[in-house]
Amino acid sequence: MEITEGQLNQLDQSGFFKMDQVISKKEFQEIRTRMEDITQGRIQYSGMSFQLDGSSKAYDSVPNGGGFQGPSDNYRKIQGWEKDPVFLKYMRHPIFRDLTQKLIGDQVSIYRAMFMNKPPWNGTNLPYHQDGGSGWGLSSYRANQFVTVWTAIDDSQIENGCVQVIPGSHKLGLLSDRGHTITEEQVKEYAPEEKSVYLEAQMGEIFVLHNFLLHKSGINQTNKPRRGFSVCYMDGTITRINNPNHKFPVLSGENAIKITG
């Protein structure tokens, strides 16, 4: 199993491509069970970050994150999944190793591994944004040093707030040096509704995304959760500007973290 030239060409031209589930049904169910174990506090790891969803559905009213805040199905974002052996094994699947080796190189680390959730009848309206820029506080943020792999933990549909993208928008580069959200004027110019594409997926399916691709997501208007698992792989030589000694989890290459348990 390896990434094809056609998939890489699609990533280059459109800024994304879709993949089928890469693990067995049993292994995928283990991931779903482990995710529930962590959100409910049955398994806990020091250093994971938990952010509850807001009540207003507005992005600017989302509460700050922190440590584990008790069993809940209402977590919006949880980071630090590389601490768990089940998720670490998934992140190191040979197909993702092939992807990162072809795009980044031999030394690959994890900028972040996060769970994103839109609870039933809720969820946050996440406006158009790009992943990267000086706001990340990194020693480098060139486009070819990053790639994001997003896995559908549940079916992801228009009704439950699936990701929307503007195909080809990664070729614009960063629309601001800081990155992240864009202005209303930029939305009108670069992301009109008629250009948007909904990335619908069945559970287990995967989207590989260019970090500079404009993307957003809406609220969940169904009675079931819409959960996704997102991993941002990056060049392992990158450090934090304000803390060069900070060690990002190394996924492959020298000093790679080991799977335990």
Predicted regions and their residues:
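Non-heme Fe(II)-dependent double-stranded beta-helix
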Residues: 1-13, 20-128, 134, 252-261
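Double-stranded beta-helix
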Residues: 9, 156-214, 238-240
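Short, conserved beta-strand element in jelly-roll/cupin
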Residues: 103, 136-158, 200-201, 232-237
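Short, structured patches in soluble enzyme cores that scaffold and shape functional sites
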Residues: 114, 130-132, 151-155, 167
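A short secondary-structure junction signal
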Residues: 123-130, 137-139, 159-165, 174-178, ...
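Histidine-centered catalytic micro-motifs
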Residues: 125-133, 170, 211-218, 231
